[in-house]
């Protein structure tokens, strides 16, 4: 029996001070104030500018710290790739001739081939449902891919894979890639880390493709259950913010939800309609509807 964890985008977050070790559950308001240097560690008094400042950490009761529980859980991932994880793909397809020339000039002969192999061998990432949805919102804001649709994948791990002991810091480099040989020891395919960017304090996994048994995927956002209506365009950034403010979602998610619309709103060339906003809100406020859709999909063996 697989474990489906409770989904709560608005739950309190656990913070741990890197200097004194103090841990405390805090609200979204506290975290927002902390990031603006308006809060101090209640034990040692440092603020967010210090290298060993307080950071999100995992709950000591999180079942993901127990190896056999990790293998029984559903994990999630969002991607614009319709058949993730791909077995056969050529990363060079996304490179323009100008990029290839630049890489060769700056990094020498064979640079493109080396980069290609790194892209093919880099770790895959899965996490909580909340982390997967928030990752999609961040990518929509920071790495817009035009009209490329997103897919939500529910991931089942192979029961026989080895899990690296402990829960660690995220092993990615400055562009978000992680090479398994740098953090996985022989016999292990799964690496737990604290996610500090999405669903802060949750445990995510960096893993190799052979750790995955199967995936079930749906395109998101899905059609909402709101009544049919005439298309209404979001003409300005202020319109987007107002609609997000009216949405029934936790405060901590509102900036991320609005941020997903910023690139298109700022360009003023292609305005998003309310159906997309309703669909994104539905992913957050009615996850049971989304999980039911995933239940209806035949898992694909990897």
Task: Please provide the spans of the model-predicted regions.
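ADP-ribosyltransferase catalytic core
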Residues: 9-13, 37, 109-185
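Short cysteine-rich clusters marking metal-coordination/redox-active sites
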Residues: 17-20, 41-44
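Glycine-rich loop/turn
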Residues: 61-125, 129, 133-142
């Amino acid at each position: 029996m697989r474990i489906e964890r409770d989904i709560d985008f608005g739950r309190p977050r656990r913070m741990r001070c890197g200097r004194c070790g103090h841990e405390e559950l805090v609200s979204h308001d506290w975290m927002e104030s902390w990031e603006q240097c308006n809060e101090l560690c209640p034990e040692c008094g440092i603020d967010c500018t210090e290298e060993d400042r307080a950071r999100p950490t995992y709950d000591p009761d999180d079942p993901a710290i127990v190896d056999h529980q990790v293998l029984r859980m559903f994990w999630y991932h969002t991607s614009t790739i319709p058949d993730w994880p791909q077995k056969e793909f050529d990363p060079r397809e996304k490179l323009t001739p100008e990029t290839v020339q630049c890489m060769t000039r700056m990094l020498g002969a064979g640079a493109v081939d080396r980069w290609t192999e790194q892209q093919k061998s880099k770790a895959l990432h899965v996490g909580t449902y909340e982390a997967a949805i928030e990752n999609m919102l961040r990518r929509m804001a920071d790495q817009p891919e035009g009209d490329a649709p997103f897919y939500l994948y529910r991931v089942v791990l192979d029961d026989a894979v080895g899990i690296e002991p402990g829960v660690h810091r995220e092993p990615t480099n400055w562009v978000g890639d992680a090479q398994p040989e740098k953090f996985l020891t022989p016999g292990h395919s799964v690496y737990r880390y604290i996610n500090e960017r999405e669903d802060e304090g949750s445990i995510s996994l960096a893993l190799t493709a052979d750790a995955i048994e199967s995936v079930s995927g749906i395109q998101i956002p899905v059609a909402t259950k709101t009544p049919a209506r005439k298309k209404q365009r979001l003409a300005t950034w202020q319109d987007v913010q107002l609609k997000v403010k009216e949405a029934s979602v936790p405060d901590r998610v509102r900036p991320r939800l609005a941020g997903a619309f910023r690139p298109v709103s700022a360009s003023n060339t292609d305005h998003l309609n309310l159906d997309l906003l309703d669909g994104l809100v539905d992913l957050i406020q009615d996850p049971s509807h989304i999980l039911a859709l995933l239940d209806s999909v035949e898992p694909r063996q990897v």
